[in-house]
Regions:
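Class I S-adenosyl-L-methionine-dependent methyltransferase catalytic core
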Residues: 1-169
Length: 169
């Protein structure tokens, strides 16, 4: 749960669950609240194609936790044919992403390697953290091609200094 402000009007929070429960019984601990703006499955999003300039995809990553475990309740878990579910999730994220839009993908390797998950989409990340030093959480950033299937144009190096922003592929 990495939101700075879940009420930020620039963000649309989507989850398959709407729940509140106590996962930490220590004095002063807050309940876990999952209260999305839109209740939906990430493998079948209720939005038109090319809707968003930025999509953050943070699917469940736990396979071996019990359904009632604190981690599974808080973050969800992978069930059944989870590879197909993640494959469809990637496809849906790219479908609703605008051309030249950005997809940020978050994955923790506790149960499944990031390499195994990356193999579930034909898309390749542009940047990401290859070997997190203190955790197993990876952040990968993808850039959707434009409508012609091309990568976004780049400004020619030095063009901004000349006042001339020629573009090239």
């Amino acid at each position: 749960m990495f939101w700075f402000d879940k009420q930020d009007p620039r963000a649309l929070f989507v989850d398959i669950r709407r729940e509140t429960w106590i996962t930490d019984t220590r004095p002063g601990a807050s309940p876990t609240v999952v209260n999305p703006d839109v209740l939906a499955d990430f493998s079948n999003l209720p939005f038109p194609d090319n809707s968003f300039p930025l999509v953050i995809f943070d699917p469940p990553h736990l396979v071996r936790n019990g359904k009632q475990s604190r981690m599974s309740r808080k973050y969800g878990d992978l069930k059944g044919d989870w590879r197909e579910m993640i494959r469809k999730g990637f496809a849906e994220c790219f479908r609703v992403l605008k051309p030249e839009g950005t997809l940020v993908f978050k994955w923790n390797e506790l149960d499944v390697s990031v390499a195994e998950v990356m193999a579930l989409t034909p898309e390749r990340p542009l940047v990401g953290n290859r070997k997190p030093a203190t955790s197993k959480t990876h952040w990968l950033v993808y850039l959707k091609p434009n409508d012609r299937g091309e990568r976004p144009e780049r400004i020619t190096p030095g063009a901004h200094e000349k006042g001339n922003c020629e573009r090239s592929l």
